[in-house]
Amino acid sequence: MTTQTMTAVSGNDGDTGGDAAESPPGGPLLALDGITVTFPGVRALDAVSLSVRAGEVHGLMGENGAGKSTLLKVLSGVNQPQAGTLTLNGTEQRFASTRAALEAGIAIIYQELHLVPELTVAENLMLGQLPSRLGVVDERTLAARALDALERLGEHIDPGIPVKYLSIGQRQMIEIGKALMRDARVIAFDEPTSSLSARETTQLFRIIRALRAEGRAIIYVTHRMEEVYELCDRVTVFRDGRRIDTFDSVTDLDRDRLIGCMVGRSIEDVYGYRPRAAGDVLIEAKGLAGPGLSEPVSFTARRGEIVGFFGLVGAGRSELMKLLYGAARPSAGHVELNGKRVAFGSPRDAVRAGLALCPEDRKQEGIVAIASVADNLNISARRHFSPARVLLDGRRERELAQRYIERLAIKTRDGDTPIGALSGGNQQKVVLARWLAERIDVFLMDEPTRGIDVGARAEIYNLFYELAEAGRTVILVSSDLAEVIGVSDRIIVMKEGRIAGEVAKAHATPDALIKLALPR
């Protein structure tokens, strides 16, 4: 591709590239009309129509199974529709392969990145179009083109190192670079921030805005509403394989209306708050100090309560959860369970005492992705079945797994399915089931619905209410204001490693929580 094409990517949002893609006169750059895709017994897309303009970021939202992924596969040539048309820049297209879609100018940045770990950055950037002389790769030209692309993306990466040594955020930039090297006019992002840090997310948004300024059409698939409001110009909602609505402006779009479109019910039904009477104090932290806390922390949580913890990034909430769980050692203070002082040398001690953590990073810390649903569910309970730890009781493990698959309505073929094949919401249910099998009293839930669609969230909230109604305690750490207000009985706000205040449900508003959470 030309240097001119990529100029705007590393510049200011207002720059425009010389080769910017343009919509045909009077029409969108990309148009889908009546697209239908069916699989045996399933209509994945039902007469879907959608248009995307040059120079816009068009958000796609919907629950898992709504049809978003199938739509991306149609765009990329993986799935061929049984009906409908796809028009690109005024010309009807039908892609028989991903190569055909790429050559036409459509690139997909999938959640699971399609890079070759053992190849270098430069080789991945130019995959399929390596420069050569007399049948031999021209290494000098390859390095020069790769370095030029990286500089324009604002990435200071050695083009000669293998991709396996890069962070997730850096790898994602390489995927974007691949699309630009092919001069893609339509670029679709599939849940791109699910594994990114806050800094990497900011960098990604800068790149996407620059791509929009060049006149490219951006499709942005996400579960995160705050990203839609921050980044997208328009948003289309899918449900059950159908396009429900397209909102031509997100500036004044009511959040409750957007959720209602996605799930087919009101926001009150999503959170479904169920008030209940609280019992005796079940867990109490007294002057707890340790890594990530700037001041000693004290709080109580009662049986039957859902206590929310809200705060900005770096407030110390996750660090506090690790101290409670025995994953970090306190430097002062202690924890009491049922009025008795406890000291956990490890998470195993905490679990045996009746306290468990569902960690923020579910994929890295909460599950074993290559193991089955049953194995993940039985990781902790296994000690009850095999006290000698010599022989595993496969029958009891299968029975337990099936019981909780049915009880929590975990959507999986069976217990032998790899947990990595499940949606985020169903993975989280497996983690919860693991602790339900252990007869846990205190559930520490650290960002439990991150990356999970709205429908699955409602199911998880109902589980929280059931736990509280059974006399257990749920401590909910969440950065989602609507969630922490909608689900919690009361909310503790942290900032800069300390507790900044507590807000009763009756007085919990976004303004009240943000005011407490903001640094001085």
From Swiss-Prot:
Protein family according to the UniProt entry: Belongs to the ABC transporter superfamily. Arabinose importer (TC 3.A.1.2.2) family.
Membrane topology type: Peripheral membrane protein
Chief location category: membrane
Cross-referenced InterPro entries: AAA+_ATPase (IPR003593), ABC_carbohydrate_import_ATPase (IPR050107), ABC_transporter-like_ATP-bd (IPR003439), ABC_transporter-like_CS (IPR017871), P-loop_NTPase (IPR027417)
Gene Ontology MF annotations: ABC-type L-arabinose transporter activity; ATP binding; ATP hydrolysis activity
Species, as recorded: Azospirillum brasilense
Keyword Magnesium: no
Record-annotated ABC transporter domain positions: 30-265, 265-516
Protein name, entry field: Arabinose import ATP-binding protein AraG
Keyword Repeat assigned: yes
Annotated Gene3D superfamilies: P-loop containing nucleotide triphosphate hydrolases (3.40.50.300)
Catalytic activity: L-arabinose(out) + ATP + H2O = L-arabinose(in) + ADP + phosphate + H(+)
